[in-house]
């Protein structure tokens, strides 16, 4: 990436600022890779609050991911709710991705990926139908202990607008650049803080300021 030294300094400045402004995010770790995939497909075009609500509705309505795979997209979109952005598109992507997984393994599970190397696991995830780079990176980061920083369209736009990466850099270039700047142990924190910073309502994620009460001078007894 051109001017990588300057961009590197800018990224580290941003990271320090985000850590000072926001509460430390709790690291998310999925025991089920498929759960991470479904969550990521919803999350890519929705806020965290919208995603949490939509994912909870899916979990409560459908018995398991196999039932979700076999359901009609209209029904899934209705369950996702009107407050979920791009619900019909997400519903189609969910059934396509789950169907692709079933065709690959004859079961609705990706747990076999834990038995192979991370590079190979990432290649397999990238072959799943209707799965984007964001979804692949989110799965690697939160369920396979991979070194990745998932990027939504909104976070990518922010990085370019704020001169944190080259304006002509593509998604893969940005991803590679960021993982060279942010070590694996900090990858989730950086992703979560950057995501929080680009949310429309981030007030709940800001650090709570401690209000100091003015000291009172005790009056001497007379």
Annotate each predicted stretch with a short phrase.
Residues 1-35, 92, 133-222:
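C-terminal accessory module of base-excision DNA glycosylases/AP lyases that mediates lesion recognition
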Residues 43-47, 60, 82, 102, ...:
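Amphipathic alpha-helical interaction elements
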Residues 39-53, 82-89:
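A short secondary-structure junction motif
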Residues 11-15, 55-129:
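Alpha-helical ds-nucleic-acid-binding substructure associated with the helix-hairpin-helix region
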Residues 34-35, 51, 72-76, 106, ...:
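N-terminal alpha-helical segment
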Residues 41, 45-50, 63, 102, ...:
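Short alpha-helix boundary/capping elements
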Residues 18, 33-39, 43, 52-55, ...:
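Functional cleft and adjacent loop/helix regions within the main domain
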